[in-house]
């Protein structure tokens, strides 16, 4: 069976990332990659366009890394205070989620709640937390839970 060179437009498991030129079976390209919008046929003109996209992506990665370093300087070692309803014994009604922590952090820096790592919080007190700002950069901070 003949192979066809394609340029990926999105990440495909076991194949590559956007902008990669890969050789795949013709049927796989025609029946899956092209209809799903995951790739388009390789050509010299398209290859030049992809190189420009890769350079732009690299420049963007450098910019986001610089933003992550700036955000780390703001977040590192700081304390975020969250007020929650508490029972008489000091336990929370519910818990403190990563979403609530992200909302509290938004006064300093916007972060994705999925990037926040914290142990389950069920009582008042200070708790360590970590946020991944970039694949190479993380910031440690504290979450202070107080009674409402």
UniProtKB/Swiss-Prot annotation:
Q: Which InterPro entries match?
A: Ribosomal_bL9, Ribosomal_bL9/RNase_H1_N, Ribosomal_bL9_bac/chp, Ribosomal_bL9_C, Ribosomal_bL9_C_sf, Ribosomal_bL9_N, Ribosomal_bL9_N_sf
Q: Which domain of life is it from?
A: Bacteria
**Which Pfam families does its entry note?**
Ribosomal_L9_C, Ribosomal_L9_N
Q: Which GO terms describe its molecular function?
A: rRNA binding; structural constituent of ribosome
* Example GO BP: translation
Can the keyword DNA damage be found in this entry's annotation? no
Q: Name one GO cellular component term.
A: ribosome
Keywords associated with the record:
Ribonucleoprotein, Ribosomal protein, RNA-binding, rRNA-binding
The UniProt entry, under HAMAP family, shows: Ribosomal_bL9
> What function does this protein fulfil?
Binds to the 23S rRNA.
What is this protein's record name?
A: Large ribosomal subunit protein bL9
Taxonomy, top ranks, is:
Bacteria, Bacillati, Actinomycetota, Actinomycetes, Bifidobacteriales
């Amino acid at each position: 069976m003949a192979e066809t060179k394609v340029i990926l437009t999105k990440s495909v498991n076991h194949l590559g990332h956007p902008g990669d030129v890969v050789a795949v079976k013709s049927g796989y390209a025609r029946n899956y990659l092209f209809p799903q919008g995951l790739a388009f046929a390789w050509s010299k003109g398209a290859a030049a366009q992809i190189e420009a996209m890769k350079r732009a992506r690299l420049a963007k990665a450098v910019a986001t890394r610089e933003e992550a370093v700036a955000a780390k300087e703001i977040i590192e070692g700081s304390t975020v205070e969250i007020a929650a309803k508490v029972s008489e014994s000091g336990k929370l009604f519910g818990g403190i989620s990563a979403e609530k922590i992200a909302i509290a952090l938004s006064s300093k820096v916007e972060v994705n709640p999925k990037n926040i790592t914290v142990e389950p919080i069920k009582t008042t007190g200070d708790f360590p937390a970590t946020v991944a700002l970039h694949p190479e950069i993380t910031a440690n901070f504290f979450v202070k839970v107080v009674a409402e």
